[in-house]
Amino acid sequence: MRAKLSNLQSIPQVVAEMTLDEKLDMVGCYRACHTRPIPDMDVPAIYLMDGATGLNGTHVVLDYLTDPCRADDPRTAYATPEMVALNRVDLNEAAAKYKGDALMTDLVEQAAKYRPGGRQHISFPSGINIGASFDPITAETIGRAVGQELRDVGVDVCFGPNVDIARDPLGGRNYEMYGEDPELVAQTAAAFVRGMQSAGIAACAKHFLANNQETNRNTTSSNLSKRVMMELYARGFEAAIEDGHVLCIMSAYNAVNGEFTSYSKKLLTDLLRGELHFDGAIVSDWGAAGQNKEGTLAAGMDLIQPGPNDMTACKQAVQEGRLSEEVLNDRVTHILQLIVEIKQNQRRIPAQYDADALLQTACRTIEDGAVLLKNENAVLPLAETRRVVFWGARSRDTLECGSGSTAVETALHSNVLDEYRKLRGVAAFEEWTDADTLVYTAAAPAGENVDRESMAVEEQDRTRMTEVLKQAKQKGMKTVVLLNISGPVEMADWLPYADAALCIFIPGCMGGVAAAHLLTGLAEPGGRLPVTFPIRYEDTPAYPNFPGEGNDAYYGEGVFVGYRSYEKRKLAVQYPFGCGLSYTDFSVELCENDFRWDMRTQETLNVPVRVKNVGSRPGSEVVQLYAREEKPRMLRPDRTLVGYAKVRLAPGEETVVNVSVSKKALRCYDARMDKWVQPIGAHTLYLALSAENILAQAPLMIEGKNPYPLNGESTIGEILENPRAKEIVNQFTNGMFDMIPKETLDFMVYRKLNDILSVGMIQVIPDTVKLSAILQGLYDRLAEL
């Protein structure tokens, strides 16, 4: 009798008694979406599927088709639309329709396993909707809801969330991401992971690393500096690991600086496991590691997806000593640890499933992330006396999800026209009746495998929307544009003719319901833009470099992604990062006007802000804090988001909210030292309602250990800034600084101290040994400061 998998302590013995073939089958994935079970060792299979917006029906079909016992059936080569449709059609009707067709009958039974009682899957809001909420509580709540949905149908690992950075507006999968700012992405990612894993399934943060475009995604190298990598593109993963305790991370298709992520020891082992301290399971994106299985395992990959994989070459590599069995054992150990943690969590956390509650959570999330961009003369919410006509095909057919991994096959849908009629009784569609208000719904789709061609809305609406809005204004009507979009769109042509603009992004199956609630005032728009909306694409930071040249994508904008770049270049935008209106009004002010932060004793800085709802409706405000280092050692943005808090208040209600700022929000990565540094000294703190709407500012003095100890490599300017350092240098040099004219010192501020002293003192002390000893004594004294 062999060892049994019962807990983490049992894993070493289980691994020791597994056969080589069992180990290889474990890391090679048994079928498309689940690992190999070993019944006599009590090792269960775990099911890994997309995604963060709900169950991906294609995965359900592929997992059945890739069973090794069906390898000879030609119809199992790929999932047909007819097969995938079984995730949403009536299963009783499907069973009758395919009676006598063994494969399709089996697929009906497979679909039924994922649809208990024939129920429909829920399509949840996209990542951009969640990021737009600017609220970790919302992110955690929707994460838990998605986890409950997936657990109910037997999924153990969800391929999500997508914690990449929205680098360029045309990125095909930007709508899956939480935004353009690393602090926003970090807080949202960690909260979503906590929520999902609280439902008893594992989250899988993706795609590691610098996966920001779909063009040539399998061959492109993202070329960026270590600083940019750490400050921006690794930040969401770091937060998911440290604050979310994510159990699984997925590698990306792309290369980074010439090394494909799935084969890179530098990224998977040195960075992810070493610097970011990840101890969970690393899985490949589908097909990203299939060409060199031996190489990907050696680099640090634990699970090669999708299965089944032919592991013959890996077996030979182990037998010939080219791949250490110890390495293979480590990979198997990580998978078994994942299995144990999932099963322990599922025993500890009762399964919960309430479809109505999940749909309500989805709807509230859309409302919390809906961004009111424009609202002249308080057109919204629409008064009950308004006679409304809807225009645009998307008024009847909501763009609910993107294509590819986030696509959810379901018969649950909603649209704003039908839902508005349920609430208000009557609304026309595309006819010039006696209506006094026009609502035009426009969309901008996106999805996996292809980047957006432009920032335009769908072709059917590009000229039509402007013409219809113009005509409505000529008739004296009020006009509202409902934006059902994957990211920023061009607005110059039509925005002047819109009294109001409301953005619901890619909302999932409850999009129509939420939109109707927002239009009628049953809900308040609580979102803020998680990405900048530029006036034109040519103004965007990555425009000269996106999507790259051949198979190279050069991240030439560096740390100046999104609002950081527009602020640095003083470029006007259509709508700035963090902006969004409410149906009510707020007063927001700092409670203090001067801040000191001793980082040696305080992990966080709490900034008290007084917020009052001075309007007539309940609503929410997002208090944002930005910071600036006054004398940075390296090129830094003028302002960066360092903290935010969402406040919900009734009319007349007032509160003081403490906005928390972490050390990580203010640090920077010094590539020369190859480590994080925590700047000290003078900073400015900005209270804002967007990256542009600054309400107040206050000085912030940060105290702590100097990340740049004073020594011979320090500049003359740095020495002069520190009175004690200046005094010490004068002691060792007989008053050098007092003897040099000020205009000469001003010219020398960027010269290194060692260069100046070595040249000047050698003339006085020609004995180099003695001189070196004196200088070392000086530098030792400086280092004590």
Mark where each language-model region is:
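Low-complexity, acidic Ser/Thr/Pro-rich "mucin-like" tracts of secreted and single-pass surface proteins
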Residues: 75-79, 731, 785
